[in-house]
UniProtKB/Swiss-Prot annotation:
Belongs to the coronaviruses ns4/ns4.8 protein family. It comes from Murine coronavirus (strain JHM). Keywords: Host membrane, Membrane, Transmembrane, Transmembrane helix. One of its GO terms (cellular component) is host cell membrane. Coiled coil: none annotated. This is Non-structural protein 4.
Amino acid sequence: MALIGPKTTIAAVFIGPFLVACMLGIGLVYLLQLQVQIFHVKDTIRVTGKPATVSYTTSTPVTPVATTLDGTTYTLIRPTSSYTRVYLGSSRGFDTSTFGPKTLDYITSSKPHLNSGRPYTLRHLPKYMTPPATWRFGL
């Protein structure tokens, strides 16, 4: 032991375990990245515990169309979710006027018609929160 000086002993005691810890840390980070790639967690915005199935078809499905008495046809959009409250815009906030889930029914535009068991109106909102006169349902 006379050949190993005090500086060499300090290096062996402190630097050796430090190097081993660094190598272990790099290995663990690599394994974590590999696990994330395997389970595709990095491709999702929010991970939930709800199981879901996504199906893809090679053929284009038939789009539902409604035809009025005068011959006008409307393409119907079918939303896939039901909501317990509906966001009415930044100045009006959330609509919580009816109880139970609000299921979006077939609509002809991006503004939904709601099927919640009773007609959906904006009368429950205060005067300053009502939409402008140019806004119409389904437009």
